[in-house]
Swiss-Prot record:
Pfam annotation, one family: Ribosomal_TL5_C
The species this protein was found in: Polynucleobacter necessarius subsp. necessarius (strain STIR1)
Top-level taxon of the source organism: Bacteria
Subunit structure: Part of the 50S ribosomal subunit; part of the 5S rRNA/L5/L18/L25 subcomplex. Contacts the 5S rRNA. Binds to the 5S rRNA independently of L5 and L18.
Keyword annotations: Ribonucleoprotein, Ribosomal protein, RNA-binding, rRNA-binding
Family: Belongs to the bacterial ribosomal protein bL25 family. CTC subfamily.
Name used for this protein in its record: Large ribosomal subunit protein bL25
Tagged with keyword Ribosomal protein: yes
Upper lineage: Bacteria, Pseudomonadati, Pseudomonadota, Betaproteobacteria, Burkholderiales
């Protein structure tokens, strides 16, 4: 995926504000042996690119001044309540150096699992992405989590899934082995009210109205 940016000569809060007012987004590129470079990008093109899953989990071709470099999206900031990208960070990548990144999870075969079809279980997705390590050439767009054999009362853990070739779990994820999805039977609904009228309450005996005269 190609991203076009331009080198930015002016920095600072005021300069960034003017940049945003002109329809641009400030950013930075860092990493590798080259110095960090401040850049600007067309806001609308960037905003729509950020809506694509592949933009978050792909090696991007960042073109600056006619030269292209391989980068990863590392971070971006959005306005609290406006559809406005305030800032974006890219990291340069080397073809021979592994990178760590969170990759989206795609869950499959939940509807065909025995837990759902035969036992009426509900599948809950506990995680939506997984942090892994890989060389840039092996970057997966997503990682598939097959739920066909999930069992009620049990979960699918990170170490249970088949990772794409060249992709490994980072150390702390492998040690923690988090749950990615689980299956459970829904709680029984409260009993429905019946149409049978309730029996009338017993009536207390009437007090004796006879007065005793002494």
């Amino acid at each position: 995926m190609k991203v076009v940016a331009f080198e930015r000569s002016v920095q600072g809060t005021s300069a960034s504000r003017r940049l945003r007012n002109s329809g641009k987004t400030p950013g930075i590129v860092y990493g590798s042996k080259d110095p960090a470079l401040v850049i600007e990008l067309d806001h609308n093109a960037l905003f729509h690119a950020l809506r694509k899953e592949a933009f978050h989990s792909s090696i991007l071709d960042l073109e600056i001044g006619g030269k292209t470099q391989k980068v990863l999206l590392r971070d971006y900031q959005m306005h609290p309540f406006k559809p406005l990208v305030l800032h974006i960070d890219f990291q340069r990548v080397s073809a021979t150096k592994k990178v760590h990144m969170r990759v989206p999870l795609h869950f499959t075969n939940a509807d065909t699992s025995a837990a759902v079809k035969l036992q009426g279980a509900v599948i809950s997705h506990i995680a939506t992405e997984l942090e892994v390590s890989y060389l840039p050439a092996d970057l997966p767009e997503f990682i598939e989590v097959d739920l066909a054999k999930i069992e009620v009362g049990h979960g699918i853990h990170a170490k249970d899934i088949a990772l794409p070739k060249g992709v490994t779990l980072i150390l702390h994820v492998e040690q923690e082995n988090p749950v990615l999805a689980n299956a459970r039977i829904p709680a029984v609904k409260a009993a429905e009210p019946t149409d049978t009228p309730a029996a009338p309450a017993a009536t207390a005996p009437a007090a004796d109205a006879t007065k005793v005269i002494i």
